């Protein structure tokens, strides 16, 4: 049994494994609550005779077929019905297919779920989520350690989801992570800070367009290798539009911070 954090997405996903003779649960993806309608379905089909793989190779899904150790597999989507179909030959490792199907589903259904993924430390302060954005080595883990020392809850040190509900934006734990005490909740974003290591802690104003351009690479890198080359520009455009909307509604600043200081005392929001 495999469990994933999906409460934070505000949706439920059903993941089932079918071998054409019976249906068994391959993974348990936490529903929002009992009786919640399934928002997305991921169906994994094992084909012992390879007939499905061969049939799909002759259709428009041919480019979806991938060769891996143990055989072939393919994944495609029915956006209208919110379903993912993944077919694989019997010797392909089921865990690999599950992981692939989940990741491809999050990529394919980002518009449906109205979410993006972001490389950022997410910290809860006064029941609001504050995001701290920086490239690799820019201080996300450091600011998270300082937050823990100051008694704040850290949603995640490296990555999180951003979900839009109406005109409000929320942050939660990245869903394909081990279960934690933050897995069943999302927090409204109270502010976004762009980290800059310095010899002095202070906040500075930043233009909205600068905030967007600093954020796009930290979001577009998610699933970048999964996106077909012909769709990469559209993928980045969608992220740009989402972030532009977010920074019209969410407080943001540049944060110069000194590692050994109480950096949280200088936050201005």
Residue spans of the language-model regions?
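Glycine-rich, often acidic-flanked micro-motifs
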Residues: 1-25, 34-41, 121, 125-135, ...
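Long, basic/Gly/Ser/Thr-rich N-terminal segments
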Residues: 1-86, 269
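Short solvent-exposed loop/turn micro-motifs enriched in small/polar/acidic residues
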Residues: 68, 114-116, 155
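Generic beta-strand structural signal
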Residues: 73, 82-84, 114, 119-121, ...
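Short histidine-centered catalytic/ligand-binding loop motif
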Residues: 84-94
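N-terminal pre-Walker A segment at the start of P-loop NTPase domains
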Residues: 97-117
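Conserved glycine(s) of the Walker
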Residues: 138-140
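Post-Walker A alpha-helix
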Residues: 143-144
